[in-house]
From Swiss-Prot:
Family (UniProt): Belongs to the nuclear hormone receptor family. NR1 subfamily.
Protein name as it appears in the record: Thyroid hormone receptor beta
Zn finger limits (NR C4-type): 32-52, 70-89
Localisation: Nucleus
Source organism per UniProt: Danio rerio
Length: 395
């Protein structure tokens, strides 16, 4: 490199530029050493702008420099205004400031390099993700005890346990019948009533299981020390608020894709249409959709139990007096729940936030059912409503 080029190189590198984004590895306000435009990074061993980088690359790749000819004896001043007026002087300046021709790759090498960069980037992303997953905190000893208590409470109050598929019976037009292998996927459907009317026969079948289902939710709550320590008035409000949500969750996790049914209270398998016609209307769609969604989560008993505890201890139920206390209880369960999810190491992306969204879905189901309940009271004979059902869902 000539002495004059060395001086130019030093002068260009010392110049500053106002504003403009540059990579973090460059000094602030760096200029292109060729034309003085905004520099975007190190390109072919020099700090240059995108324009000069592209010009230099094209010149080398297509061997264009022999075709360049200066009209002014090779003495053109190259800046961001004049850089496109003389290709020969611009290329000479690129060489003078130190841009390396041997670093310009042909198409095949450039594609291979790009592929390698993408592969390395993806590998680092996977390693970072794996490191993040494995480094997340798992339950403490106290949290394990909390998880044990809530899991046992759920299993002790969850009808038929893990044997619900063997124990279930299908709702039919003539009542409830035993489930047989050939019944799967072909359970008879009660004829849909006209308009928005409730199918009284289906509703009467549902009322037979509603009281034990509600009782099991109450029993679940009573087995949690945090809940039992709350004032009785708050316990009642929490139970009335969460009952439909927990029953819906328990039905949703017993969704069977083969027969496209939910199993209520661990014993009655119903189709979407039967649940809708039996009084729940559009609420049935929300419960079935939740069941379909949860089937990909592969929740275990502890996760279902913790989800129920989080729903039970919702501090925003109207009329509560111990709001802060209930909020703290829910936060303890949420933290233990998150740590347990870390321990389980699910392969579903963003598993924890996606699962928390199901709480929102269940709250919506509860709100929709409250509205639907008023319609059911109009459509169905009062004597068909079990006393506990009315006690829980009437305001």
């Amino acid at each position: 490199m000539s002495e004059q080029a060395d001086k130019c190189n030093s002068r260009w590198k010392d110049e500053a530029m106002q504003n403009g984004y540059i990579p973090s590895y460059l000094d602030k306000d760096e200029l292109c050493v060729v034309c003085g435009d905004k520099a975007t990074g190190y390109h072919y061993r020099c700090i240059t702008c995108e324009g000069c980088k592209g010009f230099f690359r094209r010149t080398i790749q297509k061997n264009l420099n022999p075709t360049y000819a200066c009209k002014y004896e090779g003495k053109c001043v190259i800046d961001k205004v004049t850089r496109n007026q003389c290709q020969e002087c611009r290329f000479k300046k690129c060489i003078a400031v130190g841009m390396a021709t041997d670093l310009v790759l042909d198409d095949s090498k450039r594609l291979a390099k790009r592929k390698l960069i993408e592969e390395n980037r993806e590998r680092r992303r996977r390693e970072e993700l794996q490191k993040t997953v494995w480094d997340r905190p798992e339950p403490t000893q106290e949290e394990w005890e909390m998880i044990r208590v809530v899991t046992e409470a759920h299993m002790a109050t969850n009808a038929q346990g893990n044997h619900w598929k063997q124990k279930r019976k299908f709702l039919s037009a003539v009542g409830v019948k035993e489930a047989k292998p050939e019944d799967i996927g072909s359970a008879p459907i009660v004829n849909a009533p006209e308009g928005n009317k409730v199918d009284i026969e289906a509703f009467s079948q549902f009322t037979k299981i509603i009281t034990p289902a509600i009782t099991r939710v109450v029993d679940f709550a009573k087995k949690l020390p945090m809940f039992c320590e709350l004032p009785c008035e708050d316990q009642i409000i929490l139970l009335k608020g969460c009952c439909m949500e927990i029953m819906s969750l328990r039905a949703a996790v017993r969704y069977d894709p083969e027969s496209d049914t939910l199993t209520l209270n661990g014993e009655m398998a119903v189709t979407r249409g039967q649940l809708k016609n039996g009084g729940l209307g559009v609420v049935s769609d929300a419960i079935f959709d939740l069941g379909v969604s949860l089937s990909s989560f592969n929740l275990d008993d502890s996760e279902v139990a913790l989800l129920q505890a989080v729903i039970l201890l919702s501090s925003d139920r109207p009329g509560l007096t111990s709001v802060e206390r209930i909020e703290r209880c829910q936060e303890e369960f949420l933290l233990a729940f998150e740590h347990y999810i870390n321990y389980r190491k699910h392969k579903v992306a963003h598993f924890w936030p996606k699962l928390l969204m199901k709480v929102t879905d269940l709250r919506m189901i509860g709100a929709c059912h409250a509205s639907r309940f008023l319609h059911m009271k109009v459509e169905c004979p009062t004597e068909l409503f079990p006393p506990l059902f009315l006690e829980v869902f009437e305001d």
